[in-house]
Regions:
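Extracellular glycan-interacting surfaces
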Residues: 2-5, 15-280
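Hydrophobic helical h-region of N-terminal Sec-dependent signal peptides
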Residues: 9-11
C-alpha cells in the first residue's frame, strides 16, 4: 500500500503540473503541444477533443490533430457538455494580456473556436470538471475542495479532499466519486461529505458514461470497470503506461490518454488499439 501511494502521488503531481502499449501500432504522430492532455470529451459528431497544456485539439479519425481556434490556454480542466459546447479551466496562454493566473470557469459554444469567462476568474483552477443534471462540479486545486454550481456563476463550496479526479453519477445527482492517494471516496450528498469505498484498486482517473460501466485507471495504467457504481471493480486491460486522461463515451467506447499516446477501446476497456501515438 505504501508503494502504491508513492506511485499515486508521483502521477498525481504530473497530472496537476501546469508545465509540464496498445494492440495496434497504427496511431498517428502528434504535433507539438498535444502530449500533455488534461481532459477529453467526445462531441455529438463522434470527434474526440482534448484539452491540453497548449490549447484544445480536435482528433478526428485518420486525420492529424488540429489545434482549435486561436486561444492557447493551459487547460487543466476540460469537458464536452453538448454539441459544440465545451467547458474548461486552467491558466491563460502566454499571449493573454492582463488575465489573472486562474481562468475560473470558461465556456465555448462554437466547438472551441472562442471562449468566454463565466465565473471564478482569478479565483479557481479546476483540475477536474463534470457536468451532470444541469450542475457543474469542479475540483479546485487551490482550495482542494469540490465546488458545485447550478447557474455557472454562483458556486457552493463542498468537501475539502485531496483528490485527483471526480466523477458524478449519470443517474443520481447526489452520487459523486473521488480518487485520492488513500483510496476511492464516495459521496451520497452531492459532495458535502465523503466516505471511503472498501476494497477498491488504487484508481487515479475516473469516467462515468451515461450508459455502460464506470471506468477507472490506476497510476500504472491498469484499466478497471465497475457495473455497480464503484462498489466492485473488474480488471480489464493493463496498458502499462502512465495515464493522463480518460473518456468513457458509452456504447463500449473508451479513450485513454497516456504519456505515450491515446488508446481507443470499443468494448469497455477489455481491448485497446492505438488511436494516436506521441512523438518520442
Amino acid at each position: 500500500m505504501h508503494s502504491a501511494l508513492i506511485i499515486f502521488s508521483a502521477v498525481a503531481a504530473l497530472l496537476s503540473g501546469a508545465c509540464s502499449s496498445a494492440d495496434s501500432p497504427s496511431g498517428r504522430s502528434n504535433p507539438s503541444g498535444l502530449a500533455h492532455i488534461h481532459g477529453m470529451g467526445l462531441d455529438s459528431d463522434g470527434v474526440l477533443y482534448a484539452g491540453t497544456h497548449y490549447g484544445v485539439y480536435r482528433l478526428a479519425r485518420e486525420r492529424n490533430p488540429e489545434l482549435v481556434g486561436d486561444v492557447v490556454h493551459d487547460f487543466m480542466g476540460f469537458t464536452v457538455v453538448g454539441p459544440n459546447h465545451f467547458m474548461g479551466s486552467g491558466h491563460p496562454g502566454a499571449d493573454s494580456d492582463d488575465t489573472p493566473p486562474n481562468l475560473g470557469l470558461i465556456e465555448s459554444t462554437d466547438g472551441g473556436q472562442t471562449w468566454h469567462s463565466l465565473s471564478m476568474t482569478g479565483e479557481a483552477d479546476f483540475h477536474s470538471l463534470d457536468y451532470r443534471h444541469g450542475l457543474v462540479f469542479g475540483l479546485d486545486s487551490g482550495t482542494r475542495s469540490v465546488m458545485v454550481t447550478a447557474d455557472k456563476k454562483t458556486w457552493y463550496r463542498r468537501a475539502e479532499i485531496s483528490a485527483v479526479d471526480i466523477a458524478v453519477s449519470p443517474t443520481d445527482p447526489n452520487g459523486v466519486l473521488a480518487t485520492t492517494g488513500t483510496g476511492l471516496l464516495r459521496s451520497v450528498d452531492q459532495a458535502k461529505t465523503f466516505t471511503p469505498v472498501a476494497d477498491t484498486p488504487p484508481l487515479i482517473l475516473l469516467s462515468w458514461p451515461d450508459e455502460g460501466p464506470l471506468i477507472g485507471i490506476t497510476p500504472t495504467g491498469m484499466v478497471y470497470a465497475s457495473q455497480d457504481a464503484g462498489t466492485t471493480w473488474q480488471a480489464r486491460r493493463d496498458l502499462g503506461e502512465r495515464p493522463q486522461a480518460v473518456e468513457a463515451a458509452g456504447r463500449g467506447l473508451v479513450f485513454v490518454a497516456t504519456d505515450r499516446g491515446i488508446h481507443r477501446s470499443t468494448d469497455n476497456g477489455t481491448t485497446f488499439e492505438a488511436f494516436y501515438t506521441f512523438d518520442a
